[in-house]
């Protein structure tokens, strides 16, 4: 009995520790703005077990941070295949989770993480100039969300920026009706989650509702948004546009919180709940400067908030599962004591307590949030400067993108990732 318990503890706990420990070095290298070395560090410990999806997601993100957009999408495609495979969790894994802990199950990704796969795959295609392929990812965002809603009885966590990006891609392809639908969906999700409506989305809704002759909807937006003038579709077609995305810091990390709860019959039970710890911000916002024109970024996506919202939404189900598991472990300890004496019962009870750890896995290379800006410019060559603004409101770093040449109706998308200094 003692040998069995020790082997069980080693098998369960060593697998959980190895992934998080290896990521500490990855995070340190990212904070030093060395994504290529971070990728090499990650690839030293490839995961093919319960953490295989996490490995693929982190690998894909580190590849795109290193400018390897094609390779990144190869990894994202592998992740999508695996997500589909894991969608129906096997009964064996469910049993393991019910008797040991949730970390024994293959990680299939939170709702917002699954949607983020398509967001970043689409951005990769845009970086490669493959707008048709980006459009396919936009369609897959909608399909993935439909499946998640069916699985969650309509309670899936939605990402407003995913809808916005879909609209942006459709608009680039001249599919204005579909773009309007996507922008409208994005607007409604921002409202539902009580988040500020980004200025760029307000402008898009006004521009397309007017272009599509949606008179009543246009009047509604005019009343809601304090915007005096918006470029028309025709005006944008005659200009170029600089689009900026800043992927700031890293998504929150999960920690384990010990709680004492009581069953319906008054039995005291120790459970471990996952809780999120936010990463520090690197900047407050940024300013895109093109000649005499400039625009300040706004936060359009917060994976920090989406992660917390996801945990809050699923908290009741998580607690119910944890209590059920704790009761099973208590019962196993009592049975061991009845059959093998007090020592056997104690060993099983200790094993139950030690293996009762929260599932603290998550996609760690996602950013904390995404800053976004759009700036229409005349066709031609422009020198582009990025000013990063710190918490005190001062410029803390300047990035020179150099000269960029645009044609009429062409969009140039610029991306940068900035990770705050590492703190353990």
Region roles according to the model:
Residues 51-54, 83-94, 147-156, 187-219:
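Boundary/linker segments of alpha-helical solenoid repeat arrays
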Residues 13-40, 44-46:
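Bacterial Sec signal peptide processing site at the extreme N-terminus
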Residues 35-36, 69, 131, 176-177:
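TPR-repeat structural position
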Residues 211-424:
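Short loop/turn and low-complexity linker motifs enriched in small/turn-promoting residues
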